[in-house]
Amino acid sequence: MRFLKINMKKFLPILLLVFVLSPTFLFVVDETQQAIITELGEYKRTISKPGLSFKKPFIEKVTKFDNRILSTDAPPGEYLTLDKKRLVVDFIARWKIVDPLVFFKSVNNLFSANSRIEDIVFSEMREELATHNINEVIAENRELIMDEVKIGSTERLKDFGMELIDVRIKRADLPSEVQRSVFDRMIAERSRISKRYR
């Protein structure tokens, strides 16, 4: 029993030291994450399986990325249709990081990724909406238009280690000044009709 007490006194500081230093050489990759390891800024390896992993203390750096489906909710943008009508459209894009190394080297973080997605999808949508009239955009061919936007955007996002899963128009409205004139015209027409019945 005395031998056990002496050995515990010797090993307790060692155990405490290992416990304190363990974050420098151990890290956990969650099941919703993937990670890349860099050594002094140079890529070493990718970890895509969840669990406990090791790294060289103080030399290797771990950068974790989400491997779930993420979404980008873009602010409204103004587009011109084939029949020269202006539309205010906002969209939502669902995407995923498929190559963490390319993602890390090209955009590095979610804020930059969201900006890049907004720019690319906005550009593709501007090109696609310019080939359709306002009725097709609002009612008739919205699915077809969004499929074309997705195809064009997906190809461009591969260069950033991202895969576009879906793009949807949340809202498509006329600009506020046009809405006001439409409402004024509707009110004038209704009052003209009501005067006929008096």
Residue map of PLM features:
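N-terminal post-signal-peptidase region of extra-cytosolic proteins
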Residues: 20, 67-82, 103, 147-152
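Solvent-exposed, non-transmembrane alpha-helical starts
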Residues: 102-106, 114
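Single-pass alpha-helical transmembrane signal-anchor segments
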Residues: 4-26
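Aromatic-capped interface at the extracytoplasmic side
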Residues: 20-39
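Long, charge-rich amphipathic alpha-helical coiled-coil "stalk/tentacle" segments
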Residues: 176-198
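Short beta-strands and strand-coil junctions in structured, solvent-facing domains, enriched
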Residues: 26, 43-45, 79, 100-103, ...
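Short extracytoplasmic
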Residues: 38-72
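Amphipathic, coiled-coil-like alpha-helical scaffolding segments used for oligomerization/assembly
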Residues: 81-83, 89, 95, 113-179
